[in-house]
Regions:
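Conserved active-site motif detector
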Residues: 1-108
Length: 108
């Protein structure tokens, strides 16, 4: 499958989630699931990122408005998110880098 770059960012909220239990399992290019959280009390456009069944953080607020609208409209299958940077020595909010891609259907 071919992918088009949509945006790149750090993983927000990393220090508040359950990620400490899965940090050692995270690798470069690990695929993450994008999950819309419209009832999030802190951000109506919140998009959580999951590794397997563990929430490890969020798409930062500065990047989430467009993608949250597309997820809400039912286009979740067009996106994939992958870890592109792991820096354990950094502050928790900057330890994980994520890139979101658009999947190009029918192309390899």
């Amino acid at each position: 499958m071919k992918y088009l770059h949509f945006f790149r960012s750090h993983l927000a909220g990393f220090s508040f989630a359950e990620e400490v239990f899965v940090f050692d399992q995270l690798k470069i290019w690990t695929e993450l699931q994008l999950v819309l959280e419209p009832e999030n009390p802190y951000d109506a456009h919140a998009v959580a990122l999951y590794f397997k069944k563990t929430k490890i953080g969020y798409i930062p607020r500065v990047n989430n408005k467009e993608i949250s609208k597309l997820l809400e409209a039912g286009y979740a299958d067009l996106f994939t998110a992958k870890i592109n940077r792991i820096s354990p020595e950094e502050d928790p909010e900057n330890q994980i880098g994520v890139v979101v891609f658009l999947k190009v259907k029918g192309k390899k």
